[in-house]
Amino acid sequence: MGHKDFLHKLLSGDHFSQEEMTQCMNAIMNGVFPDTVIAALLALLEHKGVTSTEVAGAYYSLIAKANTIDLSPDAVDTCGTGGDHAGTYNISTIGSIIANSTGVSIAKHGNRSVTSSCGSADVLEELGFRIDLPVEATVELYARTGFSFLFAPLFHPSMKRVAHIRKELGIRTIFNMLGPLINPARSKRQLVGVYSSELMELYTEVLLQTGTRHAMIVHAMTEEGVSLDEPSLNGPTYIVEIQNGYVCRHTVYPEDFGLDRHPLSAIQGGERKQNAAIIRSILDGSASPAQIDAALYTSAMACYVSGHARCIDDGLTISRESLESGDTDRKFREILDFNAELSARYREAVN
């Protein structure tokens, strides 16, 4: 099929088969289509509504092109879709840092901001973490600390083809959905925050197909009526849990875990300097209760899917103990120090 065939199909409101989506994505990533066509395809897909079959087709295209890394299938990824436009600080990033300090291995897949003011790569860089270490250095960092950040452009070089188009479009696209699925470490334990409730079933279908071991797909609402791609501190959090092929669904509230309710404004952030300052204040204990609770809530879920905690309650307890004792701050300083040592030892891997 040529680009006109793909465009006509989308303009008619028809869905792609898995094979058609793989073919279309291959053409996009291999530079067959010009920028204008790619932008039109991405916008029309989003307008039509992406199906689980289309996401699976795109997944198989991108994962075949990825530079994979050998860590551990039990490492947890907290990469979410982003794109909820709630303006929160980088909660999943600090959540993964806290979880790591409790003994959870982390293989966080992430990138610079596309639809937000500050992506996980942006805030880690602002905190002094070099995000673009070569693969062998990332393996060393993980071996010593159990923490790794998998910078998407390094492991998915074909994504450079669409980076500027995504930035110029400034809207959610199928690539937001793919981020949590194409972890180059092939993580089988995941905490996936999604920006809409409709995506929960889509991710369930795709993760079952791709063989996850234990995943929680999370979507939440606030009292203000705002959708979140992370647990809510003042409204319901909807969870689809997948464990060894079995699926169950939960709805939880902050008070179920002894957490106070806080308005959305209490956990909002901004640009990278502001978000990095919030994370530093969480690490040193000077952050607001809301900022700390949001981080602990996410860490608790990461601890649970890792198998390190028996339940979310247990995960919350060990996360709080690690943060309040100073263990999280000490562990993150260790990560930063070794990251700097590796940075001095290895040449830049990606521009």
Curated annotation (Swiss-Prot):
Signal peptide: none annotated. Its EC number is 2.4.2.18. Keywords: Amino-acid biosynthesis, Aromatic amino acid biosynthesis, Glycosyltransferase, Magnesium, Metal-binding, Transferase, Tryptophan biosynthesis. One of its GO terms (biological process) is L-tryptophan biosynthetic process. One of its GO terms (molecular function) is magnesium ion binding. Mg(2+) 1 binds at S92, E230. Pfam families: Glycos_trans_3N, Glycos_transf_3. Pathway: Amino-acid biosynthesis; L-tryptophan biosynthesis; L-tryptophan from chorismate: step 2/5. 5-phospho-alpha-D-ribose 1-diphosphate binds at residues 80, 83-84, 88, 90-93, 108-116, 120. InterPro entries: Anthranilate_Pribosyl_Tfrase (IPR005940), Glycosyl_Trfase_fam3 (IPR000312), Glycosyl_Trfase_fam3_N_dom (IPR017459), Glycosyl_Trfase_fam3_N_dom_sf (IPR036320), Nuc_phospho_transferase (IPR035902). Its cofactor is Mg(2+). GO terms for cellular component: cytosol. Binds 2 magnesium ions per monomer. It catalyses: N-(5-phospho-beta-D-ribosyl)anthranilate + diphosphate = 5-phospho-alpha-D-ribose 1-diphosphate + anthranilate. Mg(2+) 2 binds at D229, E230. The keyword Glycosyltransferase applies. It is an enzyme of class 2 (transferase). Anthranilate 1 binds at G80, N111. Anthranilate 2 binds at R166. Belongs to the anthranilate phosphoribosyltransferase family. This is Anthranilate phosphoribosyltransferase.
